[in-house]
From Swiss-Prot:
GO terms for biological process: cell division; regulation of division septum assembly. Disulfide bonds: none annotated. It comes from Paracidovorax citrulli (strain AAC00-1). NCBIfam families: minE, PRK00296.1, PRK13989.1. Signal peptide: none annotated. This is Cell division topological specificity factor. Keywords: Cell cycle, Cell division. It comes from the Bacteria. Prevents the cell division inhibition by proteins MinC and MinD at internal division sites while permitting inhibition at polar sites. This ensures cell division at the proper site by restricting the formation of a division septum at the midpoint of the long axis of the cell. InterPro entries: MinE, MinE_sf.
Length: 88
């Protein structure tokens, strides 16, 4: 009888398990929606590198490229900086 009532009324899930399931779904959607080859931190890293390098050499944001490449089971962070001919 109890199983019949739970079938009709539905078993109440614990709040924590419901929240966990929802979070897993949200994370899965976010991972699928973004470019897997470019982590979220790359644009911020590029801006910070430009700011630091600009203290010593005059460069623009276009002079610096940051890219993350996956090779087999390794991740390689590649930073290319086009330096001017003369230093300040």
């Amino acid at each position: 009888m109890a199983s019949f009532l739970s079938f009709l009324l539905g078993e109440k899930k614990k709040t924590a398990s419901v929240a966990k399931e929802r979070l897993q779904i949200i994370l899965a959607h976010e991972r699928n929606g973004r470019n897997a080859s470019e982590p979220d931190y790359l644009p911020a890293l590029q801006r910070e590198l430009v700011a630091v390098i600009s203290k010593y050499v005059k460069i623009s944001p276009e002079d610096l490229k940051v890219q993350l490449e996956r090779q087999d089971n390794l991740e390689v962070l590649e930073v290319k900086i086009e330096l001017p001919d003369t230093v300040r």
